[in-house]
């Protein structure tokens, strides 16, 4: 008769959780940041608020964003005027959009990841679905299972309403699932649609305007598993260590509340200061066991909450400008896509590393860090190891 410890050992994988594929998707509607203030104030019938528009123009100019992708087109907004007012009851209209669009966009990203993975979708054992865009029962995880035609006994985990740090959370969960379940193949999907947060401008709620200047729509997917099948599965990154912490004295720094008017966001001005003040401690905990204290010697994937956060982290750690290249590139080309951002950055990094003829997926370096920042203020830390190209 086998013992419990023997059963447990047999259930576990041998090697570390490995990212085996990455896929991304965006809505077709591309919005240029340079012309967005004109569009935004026109569609929300706020052109008379000239001083506020000038403030918003400055926010957009300083955002370091060139373009974003949005499900909400001019036609959709004209058909749903309640979304264009500030704090008008509009949750039903928003929910009707996102309960369809979030799984649909997630499917686009997942199909690309599954294609790169090269294995039949019947080998997917677990699904993690993450979104801050609306809620529903059964959830977006269920809808995606149906859209992809996954097996009904895939083990699903639905993450609703976590915010921007959740891009790091999905790595932590996928790592635990892959390493503790032999032969597990975890499909991870983050899908975010700003139809829940779009609203007209307000003179009294400028942090709402910050969100209107930064947020974009996107979905990204990973396939994660331990012990890759030789010749069939091609590792991209290994996940070595993860942590989550709440920054001290940060209550109320980033809040989101789902109300009749949709999802409202509240930001304190000093979010960049809180992040930069706490990042050193997170790095020491993560990299001291590896004997690494030079943070220019690792590759960087940081959630781009906004340019000020990246600037202050760079300054605090004396990082070379190229360390945040992939992060800034994604911010510039897509805006802040909440949880999906760090997956996009990972994809950008491995592609650019190959294009530049570097010898690893992590810009030619072996070790790297992935950070998620969001409500709480919560910080997710993931230590990654690159793979030889």
Swiss-Prot record:
Gene Ontology molecular-function annotations: naringenin-chalcone synthase activity
Q: Which reaction is recorded as catalysed by this protein? A: (E)-4-coumaroyl-CoA + 3 malonyl-CoA + 3 H(+) = 2',4,4',6'-tetrahydroxychalcone + 3 CO2 + 4 CoA
Question: Biological process (GO) annotations?
Answer: flavonoid biosynthetic process; polyketide biosynthetic process
Annotated Pfam families: Chal_sti_synt_C, Chal_sti_synt_N
Named in its record, the pathway it takes part in is: Secondary metabolite biosynthesis; flavonoid biosynthesis
Provide the E.C. number(s) assigned to this enzyme. 2.3.1.74
Where are the catalytic residues?
164
Q: Keyword set for this entry? A: Acyltransferase, Flavonoid biosynthesis, Transferase
Supply the Gene3D superfamilies for this chain.
Answer: 3.40.47.10
Superkingdom in the source lineage: Eukaryota
Q: Where are the transmembrane segments?
A: none
Q: What does this protein do?
A: The primary product of this enzyme is 4,2',4',6'-tetrahydroxychalcone (also termed naringenin-chalcone or chalcone) which can under specific conditions spontaneously isomerize into naringenin.
What family does the Swiss-Prot or TrEMBL record give for this protein? Belongs to the thiolase-like superfamily. Chalcone/stilbene synthases family.
Q: What is this protein called?
A: Chalcone synthase 2
């Amino acid at each position: 008769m086998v013992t419990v410890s023997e059963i447990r050992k047999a259930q576990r994988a041998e090697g570390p959780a490995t990212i085996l594929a990455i896929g991304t998707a965006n809505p077709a509607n591309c919005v240029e940041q340079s012309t967005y203030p004109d569009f935004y104030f026109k569609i929300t019938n706020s052109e008379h608020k000239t001083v506020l528009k000038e403030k918003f123009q400055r926010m957009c100019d300083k955002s370091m964003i060139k373009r974003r992708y949005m499900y909400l087109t001019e036609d959709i907004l004209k058909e749903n005027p309640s979304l264009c007012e500030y704090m008008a009851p509009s949750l039903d209209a928003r929910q009707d959009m996102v309960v369809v669009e979030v799984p649909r966009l997630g499917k686009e990203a997942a199909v690309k990841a599954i294609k790169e993975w090269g294995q039949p979708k019947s080998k997917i054992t677990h699904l993690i679905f993450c979104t801050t865009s609306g809620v529903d029962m059964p959830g977006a995880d269920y809808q995606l299972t149906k859209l992809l035609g996954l097996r009904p006994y895939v083990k699903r985990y639905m993450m609703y309403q976590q915010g921007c740090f959740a891009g790091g959370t999905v790595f932590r969960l996928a790592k635990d699932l892959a390493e503790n379940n032999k032969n597990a193949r975890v499909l991870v999907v983050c899908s975010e649609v700003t139809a829940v947060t779009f609203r007209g401008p307000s003179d009294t709620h400028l942090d709402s305007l910050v969100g209107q200047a930064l947020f974009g729509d996107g979905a990204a997917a990973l396939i994660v598993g331990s012990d890759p099948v030789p010749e069939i599965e091609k590792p991209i990154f290994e996940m070595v260590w993860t942590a989550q912490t709440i920054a001290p004295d940060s209550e109320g720094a980033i809040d989101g509340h789902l109300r009749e008017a949709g999802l409202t966001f509240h930001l304190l001005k000093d979010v960049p200061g809180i992040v930069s003040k706490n990042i050193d401690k997170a790095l020491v905990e993560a990299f001291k066991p590896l004997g690494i204290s030079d943070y220019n010697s690792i590759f960087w994937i940081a959630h781009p909450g906004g340019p000020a956060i990246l600037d202050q982290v760079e300054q605090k750690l004396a990082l070379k400008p190229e360390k945040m290249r992939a992060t800034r590139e994604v911010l510039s080309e897509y805006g802040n896509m909440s949880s999906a951002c760090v997956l996009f950055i990972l994809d950008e990094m491995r592609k650019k590393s190959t294009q530049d003829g570097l010898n690893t997926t992590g810009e030619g370096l072996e070790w790297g860090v992935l950070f998620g920042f969001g409500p709480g203020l919560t910080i997710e830390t993931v230590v990654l190891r690159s793979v030889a190209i």
